[in-house]
């Protein structure tokens, strides 16, 4: 979103005044900037021309401060808050606890680190449970209420949870609410988003042929990705409210010029036409600047876009080479250097009589920054040689609990390392590439596959099903 006003709390009071973006009622969110002092949530205000609201809060739980006055939309927003006040207050308290634990985790190690991770999981489970209670309360109230913008906003939120949460328990209720809508509400951006969540398109994956569609420039001319067949394409899904998206634009410009003979950069806005036109006034793009005018429900849904910036590298023959999410200075150059070249093949061999596998195949990985270049098995150790790719001058870290797990369940701890120290920040060089070696206790002689595990937490890096035999 865009910051429209700032005030400081003085003597228990704050005041905002400004011009609305249109004659329609729109959502504005009040947030606090004091990290750790107030929960990382927002208070929703629905504001149109000549709207006057009074906000009252008697604690730090911003999301449940009471709002008086305003339109039908604001009154329904307050009804939603009142219906779940107990759960929302508990949720905000829990997020404060999570923030404190997250701060403590940065300097923790060993058993203390594991204890904090366990507590973080417990608070996350509490928050998930509370969120589901809130959703159930929302659904009950929505079934009894007239549809308005806040109603649709709530339905859209339920649709997003359905999209992201594989165990979402209210799919049937969301479908029932959606099916009850008149066509005029189904055809809104929120209505289309909920439809996409209920009936998602097939998402194209790395290695598959790229999805295409009608893509419009600012003059209304239609383009297609297939127009660039024979060249690499770097797709950039973005919006003006995404800080890293804007931060990436100078590097995208540099890349578009550096690789102009072999690669086309295509920035695809996921905003409305109005928002897109406004965004390029402040952030003009000198390369392909397109939009399918379907928000997250068109080509973005085909590529599984959730967070942004979301990048997709497409090969000259039209297949997807690699997709990734997020940005840091220099990362795009690192990624193109890595993926715009022939990929190394798996080779089985020996080194001084020990079995080796160069660039071993694996089943799944959440550790895109790590590429295992060789596995060597000796009588005294299993050796992993790793090449890392990451944001230049940023750090990566492997936990002291990093280990291997053989296909028979044998756990092999780290014996020693070369090139980095476990449990400590390793800052990447300016190239964004680095090599290091990990020595683990030997895997069983009969092993066919094993897993690399940085730890047991949900956020730990894992590479599963690493194959060491043909």
Q: Where are the regions a protein language model picked out?
A:
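Conserved redox-active cysteine motifs that mediate thiol-disulfide chemistry
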Residues: 229-230, 237-254
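Short, well-ordered beta-strand segments enriched in hydrophobic/aromatic residues
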Residues: 381-390
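Short, internal strand/loop/helix patches
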Residues: 280-317
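A non-transmembrane, solvent-exposed segment enriched in polar/low-complexity residues
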Residues: 1-126
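Structural microenvironment flanking redox-active thiols in thiol-disulfide oxidoreductases
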Residues: 246-283, 294-301
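N-terminal "domain-start" segment that seeds a small globular fold
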Residues: 192-225, 285-288, 341-344
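Short, solvent-exposed, Trp/other aromatic-anchored flexible loops in extracytoplasmic proteins
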Residues: 413-457
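Thiol-/selenol-based redox modules, centered on thioredoxin-like
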Residues: 316-344
């Amino acid at each position: 979103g865009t910051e429209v006003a700032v005030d400081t709390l003085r003597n228990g009071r704050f005041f905002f005044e400004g011009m609305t973006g249109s004659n329609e009622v729109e959502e504005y969110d009040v947030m606090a900037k004091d990290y750790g002092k107030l929960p990382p949530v927002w208070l929703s205000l629905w504001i149109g021309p000549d709207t006057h609201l009074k906000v009252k809060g008697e604690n730090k739980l911003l999301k449940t401060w009471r709002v008086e006055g305003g339109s039908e939309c604001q009154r329904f927003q307050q009804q939603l808050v009142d219906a779940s006040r107990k759960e929302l207050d508990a949720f905000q308290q829990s997020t404060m606890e999570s923030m404190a634990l997250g701060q403590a985790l940065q300097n923790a190690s060993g058993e203390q680190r594991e204890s904090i991770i366990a507590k973080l999981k417990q608070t996350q489970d509490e928050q998930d449970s509370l969120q589901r209670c809130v959703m159930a309360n929302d659904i009950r109230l929505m079934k009894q209420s007239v549809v308005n913008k806040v109603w649709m906003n709530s339905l859209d939120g339920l649709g997003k949870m359905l999209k992201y949460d594989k165990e979402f328990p209210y799919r049937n209720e969301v479908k029932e609410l959606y099916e009850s809508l008149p066509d005029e509400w189904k055809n809104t951006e929120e209505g289309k988003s909920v439809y996409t969540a209920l009936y998602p398109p097939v998402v194209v994956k790395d290695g598959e042929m790229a999805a295409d569609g009608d893509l419009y420039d600012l003059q209304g001319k239609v383009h297609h990705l297939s127009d660039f067949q024979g060249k690499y394409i770097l797709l950039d899904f973005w919006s003006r409210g995404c800080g890293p998206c804007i931060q990436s634009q100078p590097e995208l410009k540099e890349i578009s010029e550096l690789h102009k003979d072999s690669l086309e950069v295509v920035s695809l806005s996921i905003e409305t036409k109005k928002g897109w036109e406004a965004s390029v006034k402040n952030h003009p793009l000198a390369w392909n600047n397109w939009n399918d005018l379907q928000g997250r429900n068109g080509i973005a849904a085909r590529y599984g876009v959730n967070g942004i910036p979301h990048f997709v590298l497409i090969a000259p023959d039209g297949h997807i080479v690699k997709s990734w999410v997020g940005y840091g200075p220099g990362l795009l150059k690192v990624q193109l250097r890595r993926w715009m070249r022939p990929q190394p093949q798996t080779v089985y061999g020996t080194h001084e009589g020990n079995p080796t596998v160069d660039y071993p195949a694996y089943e799944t990985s959440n550790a895109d920054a790590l590429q295992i270049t060789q596995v060597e098995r000796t009588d005294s150790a299993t050796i992993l040689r790793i090449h890392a790719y990451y944001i230049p001058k940023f750090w990566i870290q492997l936990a002291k609990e990093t280990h291997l797990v053989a296909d028979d369940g044998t756990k092999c701890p780290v014996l020693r390392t070369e090139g980095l120290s476990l449990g400590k920040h390793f800052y990447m060089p300016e190239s964004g590439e680095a090599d290091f070696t990990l020595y683990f206790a030997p895997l069983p002689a009969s092993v066919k596959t094993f897993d690399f595990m940085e730890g047991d937490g949900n956020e730990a890096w894992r590479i599963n099903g690493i194959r060491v035999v043909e």
